[in-house]
Amino acid sequence: MSLSFLSECKEKVFQRIDTLLPDTNKIISAMRYSALADSKCIRAGLIFASGNLNKEISELALIDMATSIELMHTYSLIHDDLPSMDNDEMRRGQASNHIKFNEATAILTGDALQALAYENIVSSPEITQIQKISSIKALADACGHKG
């Protein structure tokens, strides 16, 4: 995957995240802070690259799938950075979520991003029912005890 391809993927995902998260309260601000932080979006790039091989998946479905995987990844990073885990103070070139906001807000933010990842898949009119089930299963496996 080229850097320009990843940059295009990132732009699509960040536009979708911006739509999903209008800045209306403290938790959403914290969600935006981490979800829209500078990142390579490699996971999203893998979704787009594999999806582009399958012409039965629409571009909009790929955007929703890629967005959900990035939201799930961001949730995992926020929780990983917590004082009770790795206690990292920096993430993606900026203060970790629990440093910028506080530990309780970071926990709620991560939880909300995880829920939004699932909600985004389930709510997408572009993703077929079979694709929704397999996507939710893959996300659950990745963030659960199998991941």
Predicted regions, residues:
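Conserved N-terminal diphosphate/IPP-binding helix and adjacent helical/loop segment
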Residues: 1-72, 78, 84-87, 91-99
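All-alpha helical catalytic cores of prenyl diphosphate-utilizing isoprenoid enzymes
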Residues: 18-25, 38-40, 107-108, 115-116, ...
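Generic alpha-helical structural context detector
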Residues: 48, 67-70, 119, 137-144
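Short glycine/serine- and small hydrophobic-enriched flexible loop segments
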Residues: 48-52, 73, 115-123
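Secretory-pathway/luminal and periplasmic proteins that interact with or process carbohydrate-rich
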Residues: 74-77, 145-147
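Multi-pass membrane catalytic core of lipid/isoprenoid biosynthesis enzymes
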Residues: 99-119
